[in-house]
Amino acid sequence: MPRTHAIEDYRNFGIMAHIDAGKTTTTERILYYTGKSHKIGEVHEGAATMDWMEQEQERGITITSAATTCFWRDKRLNIIDTPGHVDFTIEVERSLRVLDGAVCVLDGNQGVEPQTETVWRQADKYDVPRVVFVNKMDKIGADFFKCVADIIGRVAGKPVCLQLPIGAESSFKGVIDLIKMKAIVWSGEALGANFAEEEIPAELKDQAVEYRTKLVEACVELDDDAMTAYLDGVEPDEDGLRRLVRRAVQLRAFHPVLCGSAFKNKGVQPLLDAVVDYLPSPVDRGAVDGLDFKTEEPVKREPTDEDPFSMLAFKIMDDPHVGTITFCRVYSGKVESGTSVLNSSRDKKERVGRMLLMHANNREDIKEAYAGDIVALAGLKDTRTGDTLCDANKAVILEKMEFPEPVIEIAVEPKSKADQEKLGIALSKLAAEDPSFRVSTDQESGQTILKGMGELHLDIKVDILRRTYKVDANIGQPQVAYREKLTRRQEIDYTHKKQTGGTGQFARVKFVVEPNEPGAGFSFESKIVGGAVPKEYIPGVEKGLNSVLGAGVLAGFPVVDVKVELVDGAYHDVDSSALAFEIASRAAFREALQKGGSVLLEPVMKVEVVSPEEYTGSVIGDLNSRRGQIQGQDMRGNANVINAMVPLANMFGYVNQLRSFSQGRANFTMQFDHYEEVPRGEADKVIAKYA
């Protein structure tokens, strides 16, 4: 099937928001209006619309199905879902990695909230152009201009209004379009389908002129010709203004702000127009960077069907009907179902079996996908989130996604043999779906250990195990994922010698072991010259070192950020072997860690507490008692916002404590920030507990 829409007519965008800002309702209304204007698949207009407006559960699943395709003004919109909760930052990261643009939804009453700040920062990191939709303008306390001020004050954004609200709270009835200089007023209860353009109400005329001038001035600054004309008294016409706003969005020069009430069906069609008019197509975003699979030289892949095929897997889901589904974004070239492609991240061949396009309310089997498409592939065997799939003859590895290390863990013990089998299958599926969720086995106790980004993250995984996979298990208390680190450079010369009649064992290694940069991990280099340790024994050396990394000398926690150089050694023609060098390396490395002043590291969390002012003293006192360091505080509306860095070990059960002394009126968010050395007294307690 040939391409139905030119790549210039694609908009791959996400809707990002704090958890209750109305993201789902906005997405839902977008699907409703786009579904009405285009029959999707074979479903009758009325049936499709009603089906998926009513079946909340189905729709919930569809929207989280990571990508939904719909159409507006003959443009093809691929909406990529981004969750709003801090424990799932990884989900947001991987969505933003494949987006070309975003709509940031704000709650008109709350303005910029903690998760809004987090997703905004991540969008900045990936340079994602965005427009802002101030939602819930019908809500008591809604304040459009406070939201605009928040964008400047809290996320250092550059808001420029394209619309102003007409009325607020229960009297909100429409918006002023500052480009057309018309009022758009919705009427009746026809699910927002009926609206009319009218003259701007007299009492709002001056305000509209003021904000229109701000818009025009922000636009003409980007174009010398437009600026010259403006200084001569000639304003850009409607099309010219739209062109300049589009350019501003692409350059991230400013963020257009619109408003409405998705729940009351007001303002959604103009928002769709803004997506089409201002957010970039894949062509606007340009070529994607990668590395040549063979030479590792930097290469680019252009967003055209003619370039060699490349795509990135950004989400994996388990579907009850189809099995494992891998969501991918095609960056260049085209791919047909039934063909064989290379997973260049793992150097494995994959066969593209079923290829699906996820619509708002159904799945469509497709035979081929082109640059710019977002598709779901069924039945891939070895592909994980962040992997590149490409043409084997022109192989490329696209820029990898970075996944944070887990900071919290719990032990899980199945109650019966049948549960043990179900647990194994379920955990391998969950780990494939979520790269920030890890599973390991404790070597000594044999327990299964689940690791994640926070208490909520692991609670949800346990809930899925019980409800979806019907696994009955005992769950241990959450534990902190401590780390160990060397602090002083060591030179260790170690000889392993064993003679027991017959062939003996002999290996000598000399290491220089020193601390690595924070976050640099483990590195090993052999500096052997002249064959003091033959090449065939080097893998044995590495194996010995790696066996110590998993369990350090203080309390058996993983060792991080250490650099090892093999500088000398000796071998015996008969008695040396890879095993002998493995044993020698293990013993030498442990000795270096013991003598090199190893210390314990703990995860430190960035905590934000939003509390009524009268509880501020209690909140700060409590955080101090948890070894917290207060970073600052400011006012948000009539609430006080306290920012602190607190060790994760002291944050378990915090939610209940905070609720009890604030009578449920304060709330908090936290996310991992960095690892830090544990104070001596605390470290001794931890070592005594685990060693």
Curated annotation (Swiss-Prot):
Domain tr-type G: 8-283
One Gene Ontology biological process: ribosome disassembly
Keywords: Cytoplasm, Elongation factor, GTP-binding, Nucleotide-binding, Protein biosynthesis
Subcellular location: Cytoplasm
Residue intervals passing through the bilayer: none
PROSITE patterns found in the cross-reference section: G_TR_1 (PS00301), G_TR_2 (PS51722)
InterPro entries: EF-G-like_DII, EFG_II, EFG_III, EFG_III/V, EFG_IV, EFG_V, EFG_V-like, G_TR_CS
Phylogenetic placement of the source organism: Bacteria, Pseudomonadati, Pseudomonadota, Alphaproteobacteria, Hyphomicrobiales
Any one Gene Ontology cellular component term annotated for this protein: cytoplasm
UniProt-recorded Gene Ontology molecular function terms: GTP binding; GTPase activity; translation elongation factor activity
Function: Catalyzes the GTP-dependent ribosomal translocation step during translation elongation. During this step, the ribosome changes from the pre-translocational (PRE) to the post-translocational (POST) state as the newly formed A-site-bound peptidyl-tRNA and P-site-bound deacylated tRNA move to the P and E sites, respectively. Catalyzes the coordinated movement of the two tRNA molecules, the mRNA and conformational changes in the ribosome.
Disulfide feature: none
Top-level taxon of origin: Bacteria
Tagged with keyword GTP-binding: yes
The protein, known as: Elongation factor G
SMART domains xrefs: EFG_C (SM00838), EFG_IV (SM00889)
NCBIfam families to which the protein is assigned, alphabetical: EF-G, PRK12740.1-3, PRK12740.1-5, small_GTP
One Pfam family per UniProt: EF-G_D2
HAMAP family linked: EF_G_EF_2_B (MF_00054_B)
Similarity remark: Belongs to the TRAFAC class translation factor GTPase superfamily. Classic translation factor GTPase family. EF-G/EF-2 subfamily.
Binding sites annotated in the UniProt record for GTP: 17-24, 81-85, 135-138
